[in-house]
Amino acid sequence: FYLSAIENFTHNGEVIDKFGEFSAGYMSGWMITLNDWFINMGASEFLVTEGDTISWQYTSNLGEDIGADWMNTSAKITGLNIVGNAGQLSPAFDNEVKSYTLTVQKNIEAIQLKAEANKMSRVQYYVGSVEYKPFNNIPVNNGTVITIKSTYEDTMSGITDTDEITIKV
């Protein structure tokens, strides 16, 4: 699928003739994220599975304006979102901390997570060898260890960052 432009539409009461690739200059166009990661191939190269989140976004600066800074080779996990009131993270999130405890109530059977990182890095969530997607339910019990791994898009570089969360009931 190749989206070059959207034509003849209305936005906030204004008729737009054409909005697309190069409409906002030579560095503008469409970019695609798969689970909050700017993909490194065309959209047709990826198999979408249940739970995937795909977003077509418009950039006017080769992606830097929407989180795809090609010059930033960091895989650093910079934030952690625990959806809802699932529990208390200890210590509080800090870029330099690599190991956390999430204390949950006994009635919590699953949690949903989303880590923040450079969108040129792919963030993956594991319990053992089972991978979960951002915001998908991750089953938890006392002692469950969730590994969050961020890998810079160029996997040959070996640039990664890993955090672990141990569940305490």
List each language-model region with its residue ranges.
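Ubiquitin-like/PB1-type beta-grasp interaction modules and other compact soluble beta-rich domains
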Residues: F1-V83, Q88-S90, T101-T103, N118-K119, ...
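Extracellular beta-rich ligand/substrate-recognition surface
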Residues: F93-D94
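Short Pro-Gly-centered beta-turn/loop motif in secreted/extracellular proteins
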Residues: T103-E109
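Short proline/glycine-enriched turn/loop motifs at strand-loop junctions of beta-rich domains
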Residues: I108, E116-R122
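Beta-strand signatures of extracellular beta-sandwich domains
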Residues: Q124-Y126
